[in-house]
């Protein structure tokens, strides 16, 4: 009889929506910092999603990055449920309300065929949209991990529910239309007098 006890190995069965060939890999996105909204404060869920989309696109360079949805979900959750602090910035010419959301070790996950191992140092990202300036000051950590670790499957299910929700779909369509309009915008041509 051995005096050493062998630890039991837990075999995790991935849920059906993960069985796409890359179920063994998942990337964790950890964020830490604060979101400042100067100007128009987001009050509805749709506004919070829209602000989050703009901020996520500014950070990862567009909505095609694999972590765009995950980052949008993360920021939206912090705006919806995180701790908030409001004040008026009297240092500017036009005193504008300033809302701060604390992002303390928030985590989301997303699937990727080739997981990144990337740590981004503390940086400031800022974007202006519809009467407000949204600024995130903080750091990110993208790290690969097994799909069963740290309750990632529950988080993926939450992300899946968020991206299929009616609110997200409405804002996504509006955001896509607005982005397309911004990309196709052309300056009006100057026309001379016709003889």
Curated annotation (Swiss-Prot):
A Pfam cross-reference name: Rhabdo_matrix
GO terms of molecular function: structural constituent of virion
Compartments where located: Virion; Host cytoplasm
Which pairs of positions does the record mark as disulfide bonds?
none
Q: What is its main location?
A: virion
Q: Which UniProt keywords are given for this protein, alphabetically ordered?
A: Host cytoplasm, Viral matrix protein, Virion
Its GO CC terms?
A: host cell cytoplasm; virion component
The record's annotation in InterPro entries points to: Rhabdo_matrix
Recorded superkingdom: Viruses
User: Keyword Chaperone, does the record have it?
Assistant: no
Asked whether the UniProt record includes DNA damage among its keywords, one would answer no
State the oligomer form and interacting partners.
Homomultimer.
What is the purpose of this protein?
The M protein has a crucial role in virus assembly and interacts with the RNP complex as well as with the viral membrane.
Family named by the database record: Belongs to the novirhabdovirus matrix protein family.
Q: What is this protein called?
A: Matrix protein
Organism annotation: Infectious hematopoietic necrosis virus (strain WRAC) (IHNV)
Traced from the root, the source organism's taxonomic lineage reads: Viruses, Riboviria, Orthornavirae, Negarnaviricota, Haploviricotina
């Amino acid at each position: 009889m051995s005096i050493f006890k062998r630890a039991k190995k837990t075999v995790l069965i991935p849920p059906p929506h993960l069985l796409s060939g890359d179920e063994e890999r998942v990337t964790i996105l950890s964020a830490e910092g604060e979101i400042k909204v100067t100007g128009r404060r987001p009050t509805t869920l749709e506004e919070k999603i829209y602000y989050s989309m703009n901020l996520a696109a500014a950070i990862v360079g567009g909505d095609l990055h694999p972590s765009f949805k995950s980052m949008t979900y993360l920021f939206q959750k912090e705006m919806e449920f995180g701790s908030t602090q409001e004040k008026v910035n009297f240092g500017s010419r036009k005193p504008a309300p300033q809302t701060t959301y604390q992002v303390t070790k928030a985590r989301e996950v997303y699937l990727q065929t080739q997981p990144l191992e990337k740590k981004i140092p503390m940086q400031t990202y800022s974007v202006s949209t519809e009467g407000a300036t949204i600024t995130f000051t903080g750091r990110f950590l993208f790290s690969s991990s097994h799909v069963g670790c740290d309750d990632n499957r529950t988080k993926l299910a939450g992300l899946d529910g968020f991206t299929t929700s009616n609110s997200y779909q409405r804002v996504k369509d509006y955001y896509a239309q607005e982005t397309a309009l911004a990309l196709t915008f052309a300056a009006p041509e100057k026309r001379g007098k016709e003889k």
